[in-house]
Amino acid sequence: NRRFFRLSPLRKQNIVSKIWRAGYPVGIHFIISQIVAGTALAVFARTAANSAETYYNYTIFLTGLTGILAMIPALYFYRRDKVRRIAGGLIPAQKKVPLSLLEIILLLLAGAGLAQYGNFLMAILQSFINSSAYQESMTRITEGKSLLMMIFWMGIIAPAAEEMIFRWLIYLRLRDWLKMPVAAVISGLIFGIYHGNIVQGIYAS
């Protein structure tokens, strides 16, 4: 019926519409990050003697704030997409099956294994990549900061927001018309490129 074709991702779309639908969530995160950063710099320019240094001191908090704000539209679009997928028959309208303890452990081990793979890849590419600038920047951002604060903002909030944007939205939207391996590779590449440097890009992908 008319409602089905209006809601369902299965409705006919041209390539431009598909690229836009899969890509604009990146723009949402980028715009929010720029608004947060621009506002912070404007405030620091008026209140701090060294606005650049003050900005570095608050980078962890600003990164987390960006994540929290990005979660709001991400949740909205994810829920809307879910309604469309159910209406279009892409997913069944049934309750989620909870993971067993064994499945959770296996997923954690798989994540740890992939992290080790990232470390191994970085070791191979170390001779070709100059990561000193990135390391210096991270040292400047994290120096003197509380471990709990870094874990909360940069280890939980920021990654969770990026997962919502890049996995819940971009990956699942690519899955609406692409096979899983292709969608995973494309979304991973977008995730890595968005970070703006090779070091983070390898881990993000």
Across the structure, where does each feature detected by a protein language model lie?
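Membrane-interface elements of multi-pass transporters and channels
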Residues: 35-51, 80-85, 124-136, 168, ...
